Amino acid sequence: MSSYLFTSESVSEGHPDKIADQISDAVLDEILKQDPKARVACETYVKTGMALVGGEITTSAWVDIENLTRKVICDIGYEHSEMGFDGHSCAVLNAIGKQSADINQGVDRENPLDQGAGDQGIMFGYATNETDVLMPAAITYAHRLMEKQAEVRKSGKLAWLRPDAKSQVTLKYEDNKIVGVDAVVLSTQHSEEVSQKDLHEGVMEEIIKPVLPTEWLSKETKFFINPTGRFVIGGPMGDCGLTGRKIIVDTYGGAARHGGGAFSGKDPSKVDRSAAYAARYVAKNIVAAGLADRCEIQLSYAIGVADPTSIMVETFGTGKVANELLVSLVREFFDLRPYGLIKMLDLIQPIYRETAAYGHFGREQFPWEKVDRAEDLRIAAGLK
């Protein structure tokens, strides 16, 4: 019997890097509302007392960058100096330029279907049947812990909670099946006055226990709640934040490979983002069709070229049909040209700020989480 541990982490919406991601995607959303053909690559940097918004944007839209940035920061919960960061009074610097004309000529075409990829690169998508959302369990529950932290903070149930937090979940596997939670780490920013006893009890009873399956917890499960003992200084006062620095948190928690490209602040012409969403869509439909228990897709592109330069399917020995057949089915049922996948997944809409915390995958409200091709794939593969 093979036994092993696997761990994934998540961070809260108030983590400095996630503040930056949410600002970048809020800018993207506001632009897409006005200009569906915009080219956006928006980067944000946050540190004590300031937010710098920069990048390359070509659009006919007008967005009040300063007020939008302040709103995102305040919505997260950084509303007064007691938090160490205040959206009302921080400096907001704007360093946005236009997208290079050299890139434009490779992307834009008279026929939209000939639209070239905005850059070269490799993208991965993954799905597994170990959770109902066809995502790896460790990252799924790490995200849910962070969502619960925000919920009890914003509701006032645990009034001493502050926005910055991190979680980590270690699962124990036997013969590739989850048998329990080995360890949980949860660190959360808090107010000065709360005692360690109240903090530990509140986190355990209001965040951890309501989220993790009781059958996975045992007397052997280890809990590390604020293991340094103090986490008052947090957010951008504790660490600077930068767009695109939580790419493993954003995807599969290390359970699958990653092409290296970040998502937030990029419009759908950037295949770093849109093709990674399409790869998840393909992998999820293959698993939902029962063609594999686990599936990883790799796509690659060349700048200015429409068709993918490669498509790879890996099923880790769990496939019900040959991987070569799956590649053929992917080519038949999914249009993976940049414009094709944008249309297939309806990506020109202002949905991106919501993706920028708690993971881009495994959340059913997003169009790349649909399993509407599963039945067609199953029939075409010859499975009953």
UniProtKB/Swiss-Prot annotation:
One Pfam family, please name it: S-AdoMet_synt_M
Annotated region Flexible loop: the residues are 99-109
> Entry's HAMAP family?
S_AdoMet_synth1
Q: Which GO terms describe its molecular function?
A: ATP binding; magnesium ion binding; methionine adenosyltransferase activity
User: Which keywords, in A-to-Z order, does the entry hold?
Assistant: ATP-binding, Cytoplasm, Magnesium, Metal-binding, Nucleotide-binding, One-carbon metabolism, Potassium, Transferase
Cofactor(s) demanded: Mg(2+); K(+)
Localization terms from the record = Cytoplasm
Please verify whether the record's keywords include DNA-binding: no
Lineage runs: Bacteria, Pseudomonadati, Pseudomonadota, Gammaproteobacteria, Pasteurellales
Where is L-methionine annotated to bind? Answer: E56, Q99, D239, K270
What GO biological process terms are annotated to this protein in UniProt?
A: one-carbon metabolic process; S-adenosylmethionine biosynthetic process
| Binding-site residues for K(+), renumbered to this chain | E43
Could you tell me what the cofactor note in this record states? Answer: Binds 2 divalent ions per subunit.
Question: Among the entry's GO cellular component annotations, what is one?
Answer: cytoplasm
Q: According to its UniProt entry, what is the function of this protein?
A: Catalyzes the formation of S-adenosylmethionine (AdoMet) from methionine and ATP. The overall synthetic reaction is composed of two sequential steps, AdoMet formation and the subsequent tripolyphosphate hydrolysis which occurs prior to release of AdoMet from the enzyme.
Under catalytic activity, the entry for this protein gives: L-methionine + ATP + H2O = S-adenosyl-L-methionine + phosphate + diphosphate
The record's annotation in InterPro entries points to: ADOMET_SYNTHASE_CS, S-AdoMet_synt_C, S-AdoMet_synt_central, S-AdoMet_synt_N, S-AdoMet_synthetase, S-AdoMet_synthetase_sfam
Description of how the protein assembles with itself and partners = Homotetramer; dimer of dimers.
Q: In which residues is Mg(2+) bound? A: D17
Protein name according to UniProt = S-adenosylmethionine synthase
EC number assigned by the record: 2.5.1.6
Residue positions annotated to bind ATP are H15, D164, A165, K166, R230, F231, D239, R245, K246, A262, K266
Q: What pathway does the UniProt record associate with this protein?
A: Amino-acid biosynthesis; S-adenosyl-L-methionine biosynthesis; S-adenosyl-L-methionine from L-methionine: step 1/1
The organism sits in which domain of life?
A: Bacteria
Which leading EC class covers this enzyme?
transferase
The UniProt entry's sequence similarity note says:
Belongs to the AdoMet synthase family.
Presence of keyword Transmembrane: no
